[in-house]
Regions:
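Mature extracellular/luminal domains of secreted and GPI-anchored eukaryotic proteins, especially small
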Residues: 1-172
Length: 172
């Protein structure tokens, strides 16, 4: 039974709210969904006979994501980890902890303006396979506020230096 619920969660992995999660956080989300279903439907046969079974799992996913994000959106880095934002070209490599913290603070403020509650934000992320345009725009705005051109050049130089000083792989 648990495997079936996990499969439904995995089938939703293309949703932007889930796609960007690191493996550990995704596993926690999956466990939250399975546990919630088991607690709500201790007799699995009742759950299995629901006509809207996948809709029920979707609703539980949204609830678990809302819980994961936190009441004040304090856990946005779990949904949009810095390294993934860096790979996507939104943030440069080599930002200081203060700059990363400022970025997430800015993003939190903009998302609060766009979505009144974490649940509404979660629904928006879950409904679309990609990041909603409004959220992507907010990310770009926050990145440009946090990273000055001089900081960008400095971060790029640091990343290049770090890459050049990394040990060679495969024995080369």
């Amino acid at each position: 039974e648990r495997d079936e619920v996990r499969k439904v969660v995995r089938d939703r992995h293309d949703r932007s709210a889930i796609r960007h999660m690191e493996a550990k956080n995704y596993t926690n989300l999956e466990e939250c969904v399975v546990t919630t279903i088991e607690e709500t439907y201790p007799d699995y046969n009742r759950f299995d006979k629901l006509t809207g079974k996948t809709d029920t799992v979707d609703a539980v996913i949204v609830d678990c994501l809302g819980f994961t994000i936190g009441p004040n959106y304090e856990n946005l880095p779990l949904l949009f980890p810095y390294d993934q934002l860096q790979q996507a070209g939104i943030l440069p490599a080599g930002l200081s902890n203060d700059q990363v913290k400022s970025f997430y603070g800015c993003l939190t403020g903009k998302i609060k303006e766009l979505y009144r509650t974490p649940d509404l934000f979660t629904i928006a992320l879950f409904d679309e396979p990609g990041v909603p345009t409004e959220v992507a725009d907010a990310m770009q705005q926050c990145a440009s506020m946090v990273v000055s051109p001089a900081d960008q050049a400095k971060a790029d130089a640091k990343a290049k230096t770090d890459a050049n000083s990394a040990p060679a792989q495969n024995g080369k």
